[in-house]
Amino acid sequence: MKDQIIRKIFNGLIYIHILHHGNEQCFYGSWMIEELKEHGYNISPGTLYPTLKSMVDEGYLLKEEKNVNGKIRKYYKNTDKGNELLNDLKENLKELVNEVL
């Protein structure tokens, strides 16, 4: 049960992390996997890419395809809606952290 709860919380935090980086700069999926790994998340492409697709479909991220050395690479960045969500999540997280700690 403990591991399931921790996993659910980490999964939610992944969305915040994606939006955080999408606000700062364009990123591509394999870079995000490595970035998340540096913070202790072990996320597979089979988990990340559907997450990114759903965030694009819901209007939180924009996707741009670029040709890099003959391969198409998908870059992501926040939409205005994504930035609004990020700001809301940061406020909620700040309130929770202040209360719990």
What kind of feature is each model-predicted range?
Residues 1-6, 101:
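Short, Lys/Arg-enriched, disordered terminal segments
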Residues 6-47:
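N-terminal helix-turn-helix DNA-binding core of bacterial DNA-binding proteins
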Residues 48-50, 55:
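Basic amphipathic alpha-helical segments that dock to polyanions
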Residues 58-72, 77:
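Beta-hairpin "wing" of winged helix-turn-helix
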Residues 72-89:
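Basic, amphipathic "hinge/linker" alpha-helix immediately C-terminal to the N-terminal HTH DNA-binding motif
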Residues 84-101:
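Amphipathic alpha-helical dimerization/coiled-coil segments
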